[in-house]
């Protein structure tokens, strides 16, 4: 076996590009290696945030999303954007599980219940999605549409539900049918720590209209809760029912659509609608057609509107199918990112894939050791390059991100300087064996250590672009306008390998 000349991808976590040098630890640190690479090697900037990585417009990237997009070689839409996009494209309105549940209820003259976290928070749900579901039920002929509102106050200000409730009261008035039928704080409906006494409050409200209070409008019910000193999150079970209106308790044959997309706080209340349940004694158990917006747990036997999108032929899987060898290497802090997330949420190693883990230092905060374990990581990385064993090596250096998160500017500069020395050794090793190297980042962080708006410490990620640098013997010229999902196709192209059809990213080399 002749020694392999590896293609390496080095991900400098949290290493973004910002023109302004104020509080920019990357621009102000002494970085002779990176300076020389940018002066002499093919390089460009690529996008690592917002819709380019499947997040909402303008939202900063993060390590999980970044590595998923890099490894997938296509934009991987997060649930929020996937569902928003489906509504705009008209696909949501044709989703089989939703159509079937609504149409079955309409045919039998039964009710359609829509429930979920009623807020624009975008963490567990989005009220725009709930609005689309109400409109869809009305368009498909449902006469009885009951909206059960779980109130937020955690991902939104503590008393901010009124605007959302007013919006839906207005919508029902416009539709001429349906109503907000109940209110309860997420503290009850969305518990995730097996506090079944709380969940039972929500279950009894939904299935029996059993409530501490009844008001004739949602806004009035909320105002009364505020009078009692309850913020949105803690609003007690409240039935919304005017004089002469019938009860909105769930009945046999009704459709129930749960519009939360994040699983962790949706599981428990959903399990109360499954026959096999031991959390508490259910006074009633209506036989409803229940639809989960996404899969809340693999063992919940209910319909799913948006099943998990499995990622076929990610970079790692594709290399494995070509009989190639690959190494994933990082410190503890980012080990899951170069393995699990890079492989599209697959925990097991592919054939030909090896993993090396370097322990991150045991310090309270990384500003106390900004170089982290970069010396040991680099020794292992250089040895791997020179070993001749690997076709591809994926490596993540966590320093710029983990030290950036501390908000300590001097430490961030030291972290960048330690990184620069490490990159220098990796570049030398690659040149020595005649390999190829791409240097990039998954998102920004250390390039902005002070918030320019407030003047306060900035510890979060940024939505700025990240560098892409090539080192190797090919005459490479980069295209402009690239994004993280273009890296896998570009690497396959540099390695002379075929690109699978599932990878919709573009090759960034002209």
Curated annotation (Swiss-Prot):
Q: Which UniProt keywords apply?
A: Glycolysis, Isomerase, Manganese, Metal-binding
One Pfam annotation reads iPGM_N
Q: In which pathway does it act?
A: Carbohydrate degradation; glycolysis; pyruvate from D-glyceraldehyde 3-phosphate: step 3/5
Entry GO MF terms: manganese ion binding; phosphoglycerate mutase activity
Active-site residues, as the UniProt record annotates them = 63
Q: Write the signal peptide boundaries.
A: none
The prosthetic group or cofactor this protein requires is:
Mn(2+)
Gene Ontology CC annotations of this record: cytosol
Top-rank taxon of the source lineage equals Bacteria
What the record notes about the co-factor is: Binds 2 manganese ions per subunit.
Spell out the reaction equation it catalyses.
(2R)-2-phosphoglycerate = (2R)-3-phosphoglycerate
Is Metal-binding given among the entry's keywords? Answer: yes
EC number(s) on record?
5.4.2.12
Q: Which residues bind Mn(2+) 1?
A: 401, 405, 461
Primary role:
Catalyzes the interconversion of 2-phosphoglycerate and 3-phosphoglycerate.
Q: Which family does it belong to?
A: Belongs to the BPG-independent phosphoglycerate mutase family.
Can you say what this protein is called?
2,3-bisphosphoglycerate-independent phosphoglycerate mutase
Instruction: List the gene name.
Output: gpmI
């Amino acid at each position: 076996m002749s020694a392999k000349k590896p293609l390496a991808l080095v991900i400098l976590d949290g290493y973004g590009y910002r023109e302004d040098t104020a509080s920019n630890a990357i621009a102000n640190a002494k970085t002779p290696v990176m300076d020389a690479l940018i002066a002499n090697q093919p390089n460009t900037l690529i996008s690592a945030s917002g819709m380019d990585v499947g997040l909402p417009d303008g939202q900063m990237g993060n390590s999980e999303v970044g590595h998923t997009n890099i490894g997938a070689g296509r934009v991987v839409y997060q649930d929020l954007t996937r569902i928003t996009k489906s509504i705009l494209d008209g696909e949501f309105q044709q989703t089989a599980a939703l159509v079937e549940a609504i149409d079955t209820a309409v045919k039998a003259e039964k009710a359609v219940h829509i429930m979920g976290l009623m807020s624009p928070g975008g963490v567990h749900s989005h009220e725009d999605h709930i609005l689309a579901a109400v409109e869809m039920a009305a368009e498909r002929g449902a006469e009885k549409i009951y909206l059960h509102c779980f109130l937020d106050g955690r991902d939104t200000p503590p008393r901010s539900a009124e605007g959302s409730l007013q919006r839906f009261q207005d919508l029902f008035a416009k539709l001429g049918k349906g109503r907000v039928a109940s209110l309860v704080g997420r503290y009850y409906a969305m518990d995730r720590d097996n506090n079944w006494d709380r969940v039972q409050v929500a279950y009894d409200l939904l299935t029996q209209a059993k409530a501490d209070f009844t008001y004739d409008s949602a806004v009035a019910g909320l105002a009364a809760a505020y009078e009692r000193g309850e913020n949105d999150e803690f609003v007690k079970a409240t039935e919304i029912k005017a004089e002469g209106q019938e009860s909105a308790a769930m009945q046999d044959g009704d459709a129930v659509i749960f519009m939360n997309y994040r699983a962790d706080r949706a599981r428990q209340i959903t399990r109360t609608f499954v026959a096999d349940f031991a959390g508490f004694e259910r006074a009633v158990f209506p036989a409803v057609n229940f639809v989960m917006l996404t899969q809340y747990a693999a063992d919940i036997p209910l319909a799913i509107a948006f099943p998990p999108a499995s990622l076929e032929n990610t970079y790692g899987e594709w290399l494995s199918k070509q009989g190639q060898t690959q190494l994933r290497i990082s410190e503890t802090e980012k080990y899951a990112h170069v393995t699990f997330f890079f492989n599209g949420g697959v925990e097991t190693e592919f054939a030909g894939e090896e993993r090396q883990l370097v322990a991150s230092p045991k310090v309270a905060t990384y500003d106390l050791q900004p170089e982290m374990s970069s010396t040991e990581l680099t020794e292992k990385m250089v040895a791997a390059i020179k070993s001749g064993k690997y076709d591809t090596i994926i490596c993540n250096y966590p320093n710029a991100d983990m030290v950036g998160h501390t908000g300590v500017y001097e430490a961030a500069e030291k972290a960048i300087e330690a990184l620069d020395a490490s990159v220098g050794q990796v570049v030398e090793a690659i040149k020595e064996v005649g390999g190829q190297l791409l240097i990039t980042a998954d998102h920004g962080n250390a390039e902005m250590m002070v918030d320019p708006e407030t003047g306060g410490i900035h510890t979060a990620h940024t939505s700025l672009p990240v560098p892409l640098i090539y080192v190797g013997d090919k005459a490479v010229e980069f295209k402009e306008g690239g994004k993280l999902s273009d890296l896998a196709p570009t690497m396959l192209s540099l390695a002379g390998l075929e690109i699978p059809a599932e990878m919709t990213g573009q090759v960034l080399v002209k």
